Amino acid sequence: MPAPTQLFFPLIRNCELSRIYGTACYCHHKHLCCSSSYIPQSRLRYTPHPAYATFCRPKENWWQYTQGRRYASTPQKFYLTPPQVNSILKANEYSFKVPEFDGKNVSSILGFDSNQLPANAPIEDRRSAATCLQTRGMLLGVFDGHAGCACSQAVSERLFYYIAVSLLPHETLLEIENAVESGRALLPILQWHKHPNDYFSKEASKLYFNSLRTYWQELIDLNTGESTDIDVKEALINAFKRLDNDISLEAQVGDPNSFLNYLVLRVAFSGATACVAHVDGVDLHVANTGDSRAMLGVQEEDGSWSAVTLSNDHNAQNERELERLKLEHPKSEAKSVVKQDRLLGLLMPFRAFGDVKFKWSIDLQKRVIESGPDQLNDNEYTKFIPPNYHTPPYLTAEPEVTYHRLRPQDKFLVLATDGLWETMHRQDVVRIVGEYLTGMHHQQPIAVGGYKVTLGQMHGLLTERRTKMSSVFEDQNAATHLIRHAVGNNEFGTVDHERLSKMLSLPEELARMYRDDITIIVVQFNSHVVGAYQNQE
């Protein structure tokens, strides 16, 4: 691999190709695909399209996959023990603390915690975090894949490079291009902060690098170097749109390498939403495409917590999105463009990367499939044309960008895929994280809501909490603590170990019926530094 390619796309470690590129089940709640996929209870009345039924191949004898686990058991019940639960919850957790200089942290970010809990096998969510080295700021993002993990994997590897390049001044772009031309080593533009299980595709790194290079060459040609001001919002939008365009173009052109040729097609025909935050001092930008969310945790003067939404879901619950779609297509399609709260009756998010089945013309789809590998040509999903498909594209990857200037009371930011937001209210998310970060969790009164609780039940709740007073400290990661509550909370808002154990014991075919993949990043802000910015004005 050429040196410049290696510098831009570091190889974390060799990965299991079967885990990354093996046959993926094209089954996800984002697509109305089959009855065994995860579909929220309120949407179960919708009938799947027959063409999707062939993509769900539940493993036979699922019980065999549990034989390696040890269970605490009763004659009829099998529960994971608390240590086993912790092992599952903490398997994918990652924490990063911003390094100090001379004993001081001069960044507006103290650090972040992240974690993932799969429901699909393999998990279709991805996450990324990186520090921009040639400019200022940090990038953090969550990516929710559907119809497989190929697109979310590619976007998680590539999007931050496109954003970083979009933020670079003209002279830096020229320096990078000259270094590549002359074969000289160049400084990396990103410092990645990744869990050991997060990976880069070494097979596709050269292809990805060449597409990125073409992008910065075009930026050099477009920019004469006269203007030094870079609009972060515009850079984010351009990066999202350009990456999606490259994903589409790579699939159309193909690759002489059969492995890469199949890979780029899988990336293009699957899809992914993205929610990305760029933090530079007190300037916070959130770019969102799809239905993942960014939530700001604000601590009020009385110590209470409030949630400030920094992103909008791009789905049928968003009236502006519905109006946008209807305006982009003829009036004759007003009743068909969104059916049963889904794009063309099939796709839940109205914005996403990939998903070329909702972007390409029918002729282009047929031409690419017919000239593609046998695995693609034999796949009923790729050959299926959505109903009422008259005026593509119906889908865009253009993000909606929100700006927020940080204040001392802004304590943290939660980025999470919809697997979290479908199980917890935003205010509960912020309260749980806030109490965790301030160590106040065990001091809060037990909330029983409108339930009638007997004295014996209350005694049981108090006893349970007393034995678990250290639970807040048994989780050293805020994202892990949040997942524990998202999966294990009972009607009283406390973690029920029996419920948590049951949910984590479900085989993958059942897990998807109860919840989605969950990916969370919790970013903690440095109130002292943020306050200093404010005082300088």
Swiss-Prot record:
It is an enzyme of class 3 (hydrolase). It catalyses: O-phospho-L-seryl-[pyruvate dehydrogenase E1 alpha subunit] + H2O = L-seryl-[pyruvate dehydrogenase E1 alpha subunit] + phosphate. Residues 109-525 form the PPM-type phosphatase domain. Keywords: Acetylation, Calcium, Disease variant, Hydrolase, Magnesium, Manganese, Metal-binding, Mitochondrion, Protein phosphatase, Transit peptide. GO terms for biological process: peptidyl-threonine dephosphorylation; signal transduction. Gene3D superfamilies: PPM-type phosphatase domain. One of its GO terms (cellular component) is mitochondrial matrix. It holds the Pfam family PP2C. This is [Pyruvate dehydrogenase [acetyl-transferring]]-phosphatase 1, mitochondrial.
